[in-house]
């Protein structure tokens, strides 16, 4: 095993990232040491780089969370992860590890807690596998945040519907796919050029979020279909007010629940008899680890085996290894649509 490895290091708040050498860590009892083959980028990565939010606790820092790679070594207590040489998907975030740079994704060797490491199917490339971890965790946490079990299976007789606002984003695409496994009738919003993609992922109807009458369009569709819509996931900023406008017309006297993935601003809009909950995993280590095991070893692993879930959205691969990460984050910050940026290592 290598004594040192390359990492894209954030030396101080504001960056820039630069490639340097770090000592290769040994896995703790519950860790998996992974040789990283591909990393996917998320908006929180450039927020941490540029603004230190979510909080970066230790500098120099290694950012990132989404990886696919090969198992190098298992911690002494790890029994649920395949052994050395196995291809895996891994959630490798330093945020939940006290800022430890040994756990960040943007390096050629990283540690990940075993609850977030599962086999990568042979049918998927490392680049395709890297898109899953944070987006799936966020999408699935939205359901448990509003009190749903991940083994829920509605039937058409139940007539349960959900609204997903921002469905062509990475999180949104997995929100749609997971909603399908839960048995919801799915109403989704996206830019028109992404409607076909969102439908292939499982949405029953997709609407242009920029349309001036999008609220009335969705309300009319819900009434026409005769379903009950009192559940929603706001994946993107700007979604809450139109979501509440729709629920006001569709929920009737039933209580409604909204999972909100962006941070809720002060003074955000509200609706009577409607819970609006910030979507974020528990900060309690025991509860979070249990939830991660349910998400990754339970739901995602099974869904990949059965083919109920696919890699989404479309990936844009950036070559150049770790040296390309900083510029790729700038590209993400400047805006991409219906695309997940992945850097091949």
Swiss-Prot record:
Organism: Aspergillus flavipes
Binding site for NADP(+): 44-49, 168-171, 191-194, 209, 244-245
Involved pathway(s): Secondary metabolite biosynthesis; terpenoid biosynthesis
Protein's UniProt keywords contain Thylakoid: no
Nucleotide-binding found in the keyword field: yes
EC number: 1.-.-.-
Family listed: Belongs to the zinc-containing alcohol dehydrogenase family.
Region annotation (Disordered) ranges: 1-26
Protein's name according to its UniProt entry: Trans-enoyl reductase tndF
GO terms for MF: nucleotide binding; oxidoreductase activity, acting on NAD(P)H
Leader peptide range in chain numbering: none
Top enzyme class: oxidoreductase
Any single GO BP term: terpenoid biosynthetic process
Sorted UniProt keywords: NADP, Nucleotide-binding, Oxidoreductase
Functional description taken from the UniProt entry: Trans-enoyl reductase; part of the gene cluster that mediates the biosynthesis of talaronoid C, a fusicoccane diterpenoid with an unprecedented tricyclic 5/8/6 ring system. The first step in the pathway is performed by the fusicoccadiene synthase tndC that possesses both prenyl transferase and terpene cyclase activity, converting isopentenyl diphosphate and dimethylallyl diphosphate into geranylgeranyl diphosphate (GGDP) and further converting GGDP into talarodiene, a precursor for talaronoid C.
SMART domains reported for this sequence: PKS_ER (SM00829)
């Amino acid at each position: 095993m290598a004594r040192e490895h390359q990492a894209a290091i954030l030396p101080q708040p504001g960056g820039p990232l630069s490639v340097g050498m770090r000592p290769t860590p040994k896995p703790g009892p519950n860790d998996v040491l992974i040789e990283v083959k591909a990393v996917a980028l998320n908006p929180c990565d450039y927020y941490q780089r540029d603004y230190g939010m979510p909080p970066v606790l230790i500098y120099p820092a290694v950012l990132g969370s989404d990886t696919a790679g090969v198992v190098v070594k298992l911690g002494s207590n790890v029994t649920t992860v395949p052994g050395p040489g196995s291809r895996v998907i891994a959630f490798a975030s330093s945020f939940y590890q006290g800022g430890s740079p040994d756990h960040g994704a943007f390096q050629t060797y990283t540690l990940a807690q075993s609850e977030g490491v599962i086999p990568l199917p042979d049918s998927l490339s490392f680049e395709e596998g890297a898109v899953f971890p944070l987006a799936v965790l966020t999408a699935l946490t939205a359901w448990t945040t509003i009190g749903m079990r991940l083994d829920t299976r509605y039937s058409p007789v139940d007539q349960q519907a959900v609204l997903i606002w921002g469905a062509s984003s990475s999180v949104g695409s997995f929100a749609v796919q997971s909603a399908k496994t839960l048995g919801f009738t799915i109403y989704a919003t996206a830019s028109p050029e992404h409607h076909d993609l969102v439908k292939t992922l499982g949405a029953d109807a997709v609407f242009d979020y920029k349309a001036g009458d999008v609220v009335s369009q969705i309300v009319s569709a819900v009434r026409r279909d005769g379903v009950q819509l009192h559940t929603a996931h706001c994946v993107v900023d700007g979604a809450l007010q139109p979501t509440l406008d729709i629920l006001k017309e569709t929920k009737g006297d039933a209580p409604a629940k909204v999972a909100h993935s962006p941070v809720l601003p002060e003074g955000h809009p509200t609706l009577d008899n409607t819970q609006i909950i910030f979507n974020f995993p528990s900060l309690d280590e025991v509860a979070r680890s249990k939830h991660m095991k349910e998400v990754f070893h339970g739901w995602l692993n099974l869904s990949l085996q059965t083919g109920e879930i696919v890699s989404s959205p479309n990936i844009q691969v950036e070559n150049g290894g770790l040296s390309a990460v900083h510029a790729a984050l700038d590209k993400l910050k400047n805006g991409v649509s219906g695309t997940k940026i992945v850097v091949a290592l």
